[in-house]
Amino acid sequence: MTPQCQSYLQQFETYMQSERQLSAHTVRNYMYELQRGSELLPEGVDLLNVGREHWQQVLAKLHRKGLSPRSLSLWLSAIKQWGEFLLRSGVIELNPAKGLSAPKQAKPLPKNIDVDSISHLLAIEGNDPLTLRDKAIMELFYSSGLRLAELAALDLSSVQYDQHEVRVLGKGNKERIVPVGRYAIEAISAWLKCRKQISCEDNALFVTEKGKRLSHRSIQARMSKWGQEQALSMRVHPHKLRHSFATHMLESSADLRAVQELLGHENLSTTQIYTSLDFQHLAKVYDNAHPRAKKQQDK
């Protein structure tokens, strides 16, 4: 570090203490973060002639080292204050750190339900309409990884029983076709026998005892109820079954693109909304990977 740079660092420390009246702890942290950043700058670049591209490179290095978003934010605050100080002092014309931001902390994925617990959850017994309906709902959630809104919006015509598939209207009104496993098809068929006895107002696949389309909240409440009755160790809700579907599929197939297509996820890194995989490939991956859809020889 050049004597000139050291001199400005001392002035910066005094400025933080006297004019900004920051606590000794904050000033100490800022000085440490500046030193940390200067050590990662390329040869020939110091804290006086550093450019925006240099700080971006240092930010990337610190991120790769595993610094938390909170630590990165502290470092960014230090270099931004340093830049403002040099700007006020007439050393630079633009603050090279202005506008830089730390990568957002990734939200933790919800814990998935293991295959054995899923099997226990779906082993509910009973021939009453509500039980048969709820079993069909949970089987379909886990079978096809549908979103809550997608499942609630299904009509009688949405399920193609011969082809073992369901036509879904996802986010942004994007339609996709998703395979449906044998267990789910059987559960839906059992439910439909009871549904015929209910006077229904519309063509909704899943309805209440009064024939109205089942609401999102009702589906969530029923799933939570069955999770408690089956003594699962975690709360059961639609997204947890969707997440479990994705996790178990990836564990079995490792075909990320196919699972993304099945889930109806948009790929933000390209201009295409969906991957170019055809349905035959998706069905093959599904049949070979899904725990409750693997093909078995006819008895």
From Swiss-Prot:
For this UniProt record, give its keywords in alphabetical order, as a comma-separated list.
Answer: Cell cycle, Cell division, Chromosome partition, Cytoplasm, DNA integration, DNA recombination, DNA-binding
**The Core-binding (CB) domain covers which part of the protein?**
3-87
Gene Ontology MF terms: DNA binding; tyrosine-based site-specific recombinase activity
Q: What parts of the sequence cross the membrane?
A: none
Q: Which GO terms describe its biological process?
A: cell division; chromosome segregation; DNA transposition
Q: Where is the Tyr recombinase domain?
A: 108-287
Q: Which InterPro entries match?
A: CB, DNA_brk_join_enz, Integrase-like_cat_sf, Integrase_catalytic, Integrase_recombinase_N, Integrase_SAM-like_N, Recomb_XerC, Tyrosine_recombinase_XerC/XerD
Q: Which domain of life is it from?
A: Bacteria
List, alphabetically, the Gene3D superfamilies matched: 1.10.150.130, Intergrase catalytic core
Q: Where in the cell is it found?
A: Cytoplasm
Q: Gene Ontology terms, cellular component aspect?
A: cytoplasm
Q: Which residues form the active site?
A: 147, 171, 239, 242, 265, 274
Specify whether Cytoplasm is a keyword of the entry: yes
Q: What does this protein do?
A: Site-specific tyrosine recombinase, which acts by catalyzing the cutting and rejoining of the recombining DNA molecules. The XerC-XerD complex is essential to convert dimers of the bacterial chromosome into monomers to permit their segregation at cell division. It also contributes to the segregational stability of plasmids.
Similarity field:
Belongs to the 'phage' integrase family. XerC subfamily.
Q: How does it assemble?
A: Forms a cyclic heterotetrameric complex composed of two molecules of XerC and two molecules of XerD.
Q: What is this protein called?
A: Tyrosine recombinase XerC
Name the species this protein comes from.
Shewanella sp. (strain ANA-3)
